[in-house]
Each structure stands twice: as structure tokens, then as C-alpha cells.
Amino acid sequence: KFVEITVDGEKCIINASAVQLVKPTDEGTLILFQNGAKIHTEFSFQELSNILLN
């Protein structure tokens, strides 16, 4: 499943199946992927969880 999120003001499409961990931070949410890549987004943990799980 691919989902669209905003990262640094840019729309990005990510493979939700490759997400290993979603971690809340003070500034938003950190997404860790199975390949070790990381993305920080301004979405709240709850918003991002809803996007990834729907």
C-alpha cells in the first residue's frame, strides 16, 4: 500500500508496507523504514497512524 504524506512541505509517496516503526517526536513523527531510512514529518503520531492504517 502506498500513501501520500507531506515532508518538508513536499508531497511524498511512501510504501506503508516498508514502515518498520512510527515514533512520536516533539516536532511531529519519525518514520523508520525496514531498510534503515528515516523520514521526519510534521504529522502528529495519531494523524500518521490513521493514514498508514486506513
Annotate each PLM feature:
Residues K1-I13, S17-N54:
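Acidic, Ser/Thr- and proline-rich intrinsically disordered linker/docking segments
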